[in-house]
Amino acid sequence: YLRIVTVEEEPRVIELYGKDILKAQHAYGTNGIITAMDYALTPAKDWSHTIALFNNYAAALDFAKQAQEENLDAFLMTVVERRFAQYYRKLTDYFPPELDAVFSMIAPEAVADYNARVKDAGGTVSLAKTLHEIEEANLPPAWECGWNHTTLQALKQEPKVWTYLQVAYPRPFDPKLVERQMKRYGDELFFHHEMARMDGQIQIFALPILRWASKERTYEIIHEMEELDGCMIFDPHVITIEDGGMKEIDSTLIEFKKEADPYGLMNPGKTRGWRPEMAKK
């Protein structure tokens, strides 16, 4: 459910239910003012924030992939290569630079299974604490060690060195592709991979940090990943919704914008689907 206030002389309230929320979802502030939303909840769990260490990245990635395929109850599972260890300064005792890591949030009832899986995969658990214990120890929670938080860990220390990419891998996921990419790009890209699901299927993402050289080199890498590897790149270096992730104009969003923001005042230039002549006179 979304409640939206329109941007016009006499604002109106529009309520969207069910699939109708797609008229405003992922619109980046272009489709009226959202003033209320309802969303589904599940019972809270006291997740175990864990780090598992492996001798090589392939082993870490295989562990996470298998755990997901076999439905280990985890809220987060992020595979982070050893070259990131230098940026996790509060975790030097748990993430040494000679090993690769998997950061996870594991359900309490799945911890024993998780520990056994790590051991069977040749890894070791270096950290396992509840959120309260993490806070007491002044350590970062697992969610600050994955997804784009990983990028931020590097940028905090080397802000002029790095940018990043957002990569969706083809399904079914082939770990050998990651090996080829890591070999191809060497020190240009530091990788971490995120376990996720889309449409009920396993989907692997990566948000590698990219050593900035030039715009031309950045887009050369993007082109290689798309054309050679079959990946989809959600470009974080562009302004519009379509050029970044959507890849095409969503007519549903544009039609709703005509209703909720008829003068085109909200976040102008964010979507290529809206043209100046569409604005109400």
Positions of predicted regions on the chain:
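C-terminal substrate-binding/cap subdomain adjacent to the FAD-binding core in PCMH-type
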Residues: 1-147
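Conserved glycine-rich FAD pyrophosphate-binding loop
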Residues: 123-281
